[in-house]
Structures are given as structure tokens and as C-alpha cells.
């Protein structure tokens, strides 16, 4: 069972929603090349225009740090000002239960 996770809150700038979704598709492609990232999901929050979440899981802190410092993390940081109305908020989580 994965023990470590990240939850990222994203708020698209008005009118940038389609660009954000294309960016998230690109991020998914980058993350597929990360052996330590066990799962990665990007989702749009229903009923909250422009609000997105990313949730990903890892077996250990080393893998989580590699992900944050890797290409996907760098791309998120580099594009944050262009795509998002507020700085993305990254929560470091410890998984306590799963199906």
C-alpha cells in the first residue's frame, strides 16, 4: 500500500480552463515516466468552475521528492503564473487507509 501522497489545489485563471486541461494532459505524460509515482490523477471539481485537483501516491518519501523535483514539478512551477490565479497549494499526505 502506498504510504505517501500529494494533493495539489489548482485554480485556473478565467478563460484558461482549456489550457489548464491541456497542460494536465501533458503533465500526465511526463509522470508516466516516473517509476516511483504509483498513481497520478488530475480532476476538475464539479460545480466549481476552474477548480482542479491533482492526487498522486508513492511508496516512500524518496519517490515523492523525486516527483516534486522532477520534470512535471518543474513544469507546474514554470507555468503557474500563466495558468493559475493563485499559486498551486501542495499538501503532503500520509495515506492511512485505502481499498
Predicted feature locations:
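A short acidic, often aromatic-flanked loop/helix-cap motif at beta-alpha or helix-coil junctions
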Residues: 96-99
Amino acid at each position: 500500500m502506498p504510504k505517501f501522497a500529494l494533493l495539489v489545489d489548482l485554480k485556473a485563471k478565467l478563460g484558461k480552463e482549456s489550457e489548464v486541461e491541456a497542460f494536465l494532459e501533458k503533465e500526465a505524460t511526463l509522470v508516466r515516466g516516473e517509476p516511483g509515482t504509483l498513481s497520478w490523477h488530475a480532476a476538475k471539481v464539479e460545480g466549481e468552475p476552474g477548480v482542479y485537483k491533482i492526487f498522486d501516491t508513492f511508496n516512500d518519501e524518496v519517490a515523492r521528492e523525486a516527483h516534486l523535483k522532477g520534470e512535471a514539478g518543474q513544469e507546474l512551477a514554470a507555468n503557474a503564473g500563466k495558468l493559475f490565479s493563485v499559486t498551486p497549494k501542495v499538501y503532503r499526505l500520509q495515506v492511512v487507509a485505502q481499498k
